Design a protein with these regions (language model features):
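A charged, aromatic-enriched C-terminal amphipathic alpha-helix characteristic of glycosyltransferases
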Residues: 335-369
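Short acidic/histidine- and often glycine-rich active-site loop of Leloir-type glycosyltransferases
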Residues: 288, 301-315
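Conserved donor-binding/catalytic core segment of Leloir-type glycosyltransferases
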Residues: 172-189, 195-199, 209
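Nucleotide-activated donor-binding/catalytic signature segment of Leloir-type glycosyltransferases, i.e.
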Residues: 218-265
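A short helix/loop element that forms part of the nucleotide-sugar donor recognition site in Leloir-type
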Residues: 158-172
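Conserved acidic donor-binding segment of nucleotide-sugar-dependent glycosyltransferases
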Residues: 309-322, 329-336
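Donor nucleotide-sugar binding/catalytic pocket of nucleotide-sugar-dependent glycosyltransferases
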Residues: 120-137, 141-158
Length: 370
């Protein structure tokens, strides 16, 4: 270890995030390890934030929903949140907030208020791109902000998987040009955007790999509502296979998570990763794609559009089908020209776990020193 990794062993930090590991988003567990590697005494716990009277130098917020609950509707939680922040601040703690979202689409008034409190009470706000920083400054012109990129997922998934092996494992054509859209499709607009453009794309060997596309379920998701339950199961067992054959898709139900053991095979099997959001600030699928040497095509919005443009990956207007088709064509050419290797080199140089961990350690020191 060099000096920068060992000169702050006394800093105690609490990342307010569940500690039981029950999450399909590994951003925080990996970040916690990276910060620990940089010499910080850090732990993840939501319970610790609410119940402990231990001293911490840094309280590090991630998603405000992790603090108050993802479906919180208790108005008293806001008073409790303010009291806990005041308590830790009275003990000398400083607050850092990593801004993942502007506001979630489903946020109720209580969750929105939690965002307001955490945004305004944090001593330093960390952003994953300049877009987020500049937008935040318009609302909080006196805030302190830093830009720290999203880490790539080194040492997390199996990385040495060939395209051929991955496609064999997933039972996919070796000859297809595979465009993969990860993550749950959230609404009809995303479905229409992706399926409309993909159907119109003049690529003979195209295949869309979208493991969480369809709004159907084989589970009993609708309780006693027999009609909705029947429609959902009929869609799952009858419509999904039919639509997959008709439109050259390999798509599944949006309530079925990808197992972490299978995820690297989906990445390795792909030619291009498609970010299917129309309005989003950040996406972990971009750094993950960079780790797997893949070209990424995504919307010209948020930090995503900024990063893709800076690294030479195609972006598009999500409301313009012709522009999406242009971006897909450009992605196909870039995949053949080796843009994926350029992405990997960029990620390793600028988004490595080591570099991101050191940047957060430095941010902690900055917050403590004022």
């Amino acid at each position: 270890m060099n000096d920068s990794e060992t000169d702050s062993p006394s800093i105690k930090a609490l990342i307010v995030f569940r500690e039981n590991g029950e999450t399909d988003n590994l951003f925080v567990p990996i970040l916690c390890d990276a910060i620990r590697m940089a010499g910080i005494d850090v732990r993840c716990s939501t319970k610790e934030f609410w119940e402990s009277d231990k001293h911490y130098d840094i309280i590090h917020f991630q998603w405000p929903e992790e603090v108050v609950g993802w479906t919180c509707n208790d108005p008293d939680i806001i008073r409790c949140l303010e009291e806990r922040i005041s308590f830790f601040r009275s003990r000398g703690a400083r607050f850092v907030y990593t801004r993942h979202n502007v506001r979630p689409h489903y946020a109720n008034g209580i969750i929105s208020r939690a965002y307001d409190i955490i945004e305004s009470q944090s001593d330093i706000v960390a952003h994953m791109g300049r877009f987020s920083r500049d937008e935040f400054l318009t609302k909080y012109p006196d805030s302190q902000n830093v830009v720290i990129p999203h880490h790539i997922y080194q040492y997390t998934y199996k990385e040495d998987i060939s395209v051929e092996r991955a496609r064999q494992y997933l039972n996919l054509s070796q000859d297809a040009f595979i465009v993969t859209a990860f993550g749950k499709f959230r609404n009809r607009e995303e479905l229409r955007m992706v399926l409309g453009a993909f159907r119109a794309w003049d690529e003979a060997h195209k295949m869309l790999l979208a493991p969480r596309l369809y709004p159907f379920s084989r589970r009993n998701s609708y309780g006693k509502n027999f009609i909705k339950r029947w429609i959902s199961k009929a869609g799952y067992y009858l419509l999904m296979p039919l639509l997959n054959r008709m439109y050259k898709l390999q798509a599944g139900a949006n309530d079925e998570l990808i197992d972490n053991c299978d995820l690297p095979y989906y990445m390795a099997a792909s030619d291009v990763i498609f970010i299917q959001r129309k309005d989003i600030l950040n996406s972990g699928n971009v750094p993950l794609a960079f780790l797997y040497h893949k070209v990424v095509v995504g919307p010209k919005v948020g930090n995503i559009g900024e990063l893709l443009s800076e690294t030479g990956n195609p972006t598009f207007d999500p409301d313009d089908k012709k522009d999406i088709l242009r971006a897909l064509e450009e992605a196909r050419r870039l995949a053949a020209w080796g843009q994926g290797e350029v992405n990997y080199a960029y990620g390793m140089e600028n988004m490595s776990i080591r570099k991101v961990g050191q940047a957060y350690a430095q941010t902690y020191k900055q917050a403590i020193n004022g």
